[in-house]
Amino acid sequence: MSAKAEHYDVIRKPIITEKSTMASENGAVVFEVAIDSNKPQIKEAVEALFGVKVKAVNTTVTKGKVKRFRGQLGKRKDVKKAYVTLEEGNTIDVSTGL
């Protein structure tokens, strides 16, 4: 499957935190994805961009906090994260760029 332009719109960037590093030991990779993307789109994009087989996709939406900026109330953006579990024997090196 070849990578299409819309696959780059679905997958924004890899998330490298302590929690995602622990998840990578169990064969999972964490990505920030478009807020309107769904699990089948995320699975298709990861398989096309990285050439791996995806076992499961779990998603979370973190709501943006309300913060003050120069006395004005503002809201940070909502962030959607996808925990992508890979099939046995497949790996993704997230330190390389998309």
From Swiss-Prot:
InterPro entries linked to this entry: Nucleotide-bd_a/b_plait_sf, Ribosomal_uL23-like, Ribosomal_uL23/eL15/eS24_sf
The biological process GO terms on file are: translation
Keyword rRNA-binding carried by entry: yes
Give me the gene this protein comes from: rplW
**Gene Ontology molecular function: any one:** rRNA binding
Query: What HAMAP family does the record point to?
Result: Ribosomal_uL23_B (MF_01369_B)
Q: Which UniProt keywords apply?
A: Ribonucleoprotein, Ribosomal protein, RNA-binding, rRNA-binding
Supply the name of the protein: Large ribosomal subunit protein uL23
Gene3D superfamilies assigned: 3.30.70.330
State one Pfam family annotation.
Ribosomal_L23
Question: SUPFAM superfamilies, per this entry?
Answer: Ribosomal proteins S24e, L23 and L15e (SSF54189)
What role is this protein assigned? One of the early assembly proteins it binds 23S rRNA. One of the proteins that surrounds the polypeptide exit tunnel on the outside of the ribosome. Forms the main docking site for trigger factor binding to the ribosome.
Quaternary structure per UniProt? Part of the 50S ribosomal subunit. Contacts protein L29, and trigger factor when it is bound to the ribosome.
Similarity comment text for this entry: Belongs to the universal ribosomal protein uL23 family.
Does the record carry Signal as a key word? no
| Source taxonomy | Bacteria, Pseudomonadati, Pseudomonadota, Alphaproteobacteria, Rhodobacterales
Q: Name one GO cellular component term.
A: ribosome
